Amino acid sequence: MFDLDSILLVSIIFLFGGFVKGTSGIGLPAISIAFLTMFMGIKVAVALVVMPGLLTNLWQTFGKIKIIKIIYRMWPLLLFLFLFSFLGARILVDHSKFLTLLLGILLSAYGLFSILVSKQIVIAKKYEKFLGAFTGALGGFFGGSTGTFVFPLALYVYSLKMTQQEFLQSIALVLISASFFLGLALTGNKLWTWELFAYSTYAAIPSFIGMYIGRKLQFKFDEKIFKKVFLSMLIIIGLLIINKAI
């Protein structure tokens, strides 16, 4: 399935995807899938991002904020994310072009709206668990069918009004769970083979290198610059996904 040219291509794509994630905290699966699907099928592309997404988010999860505290706050989202990932992967077996197009439109629209409207949307504490469950269900469905979990998971976490460090750890925990659930869902639907697992694991290496370089730049950003970078990445990712779908 993979020759030397394909391996080189995968390395370059995941190096760039890792760099994007290092600077903004998100984007590795979406960026990688957007480019990979230009050269190979979406089913292969989705399978390849599982291990890089899982391992890079594991690295990002550890920081100054206690993980247990984040899990307690996010558990409704994580539960429904798990359940609906299987439904989304079932859709991937058949057809996911429309969902992919919709995903790209929503991402770009939200990013553009948030940049133009300076006031950040903030979710009140009393609505967090309900909206977390709804977001998890939607994220699992989109992620399982397109391999891209950034909508609406990143948008939900961003709306919780966290510090930069809290956001990075929280989104990493959510996305590491999403990658793990995606792997289970793909396996259950016979979309993940041992060969794809091996190449997906290899793809984590250039992802880590790119992420390391990106994190060196990230720590030089202040909160406002970081948020602008994050929102700009949402727009770019959305446009890439739209291009992939049409």
Stretches with model-predicted labels:
Residues 1-39, 121-171, 178:
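Selected transmembrane alpha-helices and immediately adjacent juxtamembrane segments
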Residues 48-97, 180-224:
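Selective hydrophobic functional segments
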Residues 6-7, 37-54, 98-107, 137-147, ...:
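Structural signature of hydrophobic alpha-helical transmembrane segments
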Residues 59-66, 89, 93, 97, ...:
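Transmembrane helix exit motif
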Residues 38-43, 64-70, 158-166, 189-193:
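Juxtamembrane helix-boundary/capping and inter-helix hinge elements in multi-pass membrane proteins
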Residues 45, 87-88, 140-148, 182-185, ...:
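Hydrophobic alpha-helical transmembrane segments in multi-pass integral membrane proteins
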Residues 11, 50, 104-107, 111, ...:
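Residues within membrane-spanning alpha-helices of integral membrane proteins
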Residues 70-80, 100-106, 126-136, 166-173, ...:
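Cytoplasmic-side transmembrane-helix entry/capping segments in multi-pass membrane proteins
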